[in-house]
Amino acid sequence: DITEVIAAGR
């Protein structure tokens, strides 16, 4: 899933 990737970029 990509949700973790965008969350890591916060």
From Swiss-Prot:
Keyword tags: Phosphoprotein, Ribonucleoprotein, Ribosomal protein
Top-level taxon of the source organism: Eukaryota
Presence of the UniProt keyword Ribosomal protein in the record: yes
Annotated GO CC locations: ribonucleoprotein complex; ribosome
Ribosomal protein as UniProt keyword: yes
Coiled coil: none
Post-translational modification: Phosphorylated.
Family, as annotated: Belongs to the eukaryotic ribosomal protein P1/P2 family.
Quaternary structure annotation from Swiss-Prot or TrEMBL: P1 and P2 exist as dimers at the large ribosomal subunit.
Function description: Plays an important role in the elongation step of protein synthesis.
Protein's name according to its UniProt entry: Large ribosomal subunit protein P2
Protein source organism: Pseudotsuga menziesii (Douglas-fir)
Upper classification of the organism: Eukaryota, Viridiplantae, Streptophyta, Embryophyta, Tracheophyta
